[in-house]
Amino acid sequence: MLFLAPGYIFPNVATPVTVAIDFAQAVKQGAYNVLDLKASPIPNPELFQPPSRIIRGPLNYLLSLPGKDIRGKLIDALNEWFRVPEDKLNIIKEIVVILHTASLLIDDIQDSSELRRGNPVAHRIFGVAQTINSANYAYFLAQAKLADLNDSRAFDIFTKGLLKLHRGQGMELYWRDNLICPTEEEYVEMVSCKTGGLFYLAVQLMQLNSEVTVNFSNFINLLGIIFQIRDDYMNLQSGTMTKTKGFSEDLTEGKFGYPIIHSIHAAPNDSQLIQILKLKTKDEVIKQYAVRYIESTGSFVYCREKLDMYLEEANETFRGLEMLLGPSKGIRAILDFLRTR
């Protein structure tokens, strides 16, 4: 039987068999004492570095696909106020983009998605197991970068942020898998965790490196809610979304998006929409019917009205922040972008 020492890293070689042979030869030749746990497990450890290129494959693939980068733009815009030094800002941006990309890798598996940004999802290319591993690796890769911020509080912020993100994701999956339509209030709470949580994690890391101590939680929470409701609306109404993710993908996923939630509650005695979600269908005829049904319950109109309401609240909060901190063209541009549909 072959024993591997604690801390042994599989080398960048073709097969596990090669690993076993090389390691066994090292032991046989006396280059490694199996009883000495402090010894190097191989005679030339520099030849056996972690195969990070392979491990990062799904992550790097998704990073290479162009996206909206709304989080990076938000960080740059907020920095008009925070004035975080460039080196620290770049670290924070890298942490956030890695976390966001890792969450997308997992989301696409959990949702059985086929397209991401108009291209095949990572797990269709690399496989489910390798993609999950790459996403998990990315979470810890982001965590390791916290050390470069030189502030012990960053780890607590990071941990709480990821716990919040996974709580939100867990509730959304629970509703979907058990065909439980949440209330509007439950949806907003979920979004505050899932979408707003990563936004706020970025803000908190920035404030560790800034003299600005103003509480941004309400404003960032509003941005997260607006972003997610808009995304749910666009999923069912936007031609652009059809090209990048597929036609009305939320229906195929069985997801309780904002317009769908309103439509179900608007006609509580009609189970048609619930039954369509249960099918998780790819049939465009059925999905087109579902979109017409959602339209018939006034849910798209309601969605636009709620977006306008949240946007007005966000703009009012933004004006208050400008009075305290000065103007921000970047934040104004983001709010204008979120108004477009």
Curated annotation (Swiss-Prot):
Q: Extract one GO molecular function annotation from the record.
A: metal ion binding
Binding site residues for Mg(2+) 1: 107, 111
Q: What is its EC number?
A: 2.5.1.-, 2.5.1.1, 2.5.1.29, 2.5.1.10
What InterPro entries does the record point to? Isoprenoid_synthase_dom_sf (IPR008949), Polyprenyl_synt (IPR000092), Polyprenyl_synt_CS (IPR033749)
Tell me the domain of life.
Eukaryota
The record lists isopentenyl diphosphate as bound by 68, 71, 100, 117
Q: What is this protein called?
A: Geranylgeranyl pyrophosphate synthase penG
Organism the protein comes from? Penicillium crustosum (Blue mold fungus)
Top-down, what is the taxonomic lineage of the species of origin? Eukaryota, Fungi, Dikarya, Ascomycota, Pezizomycotina
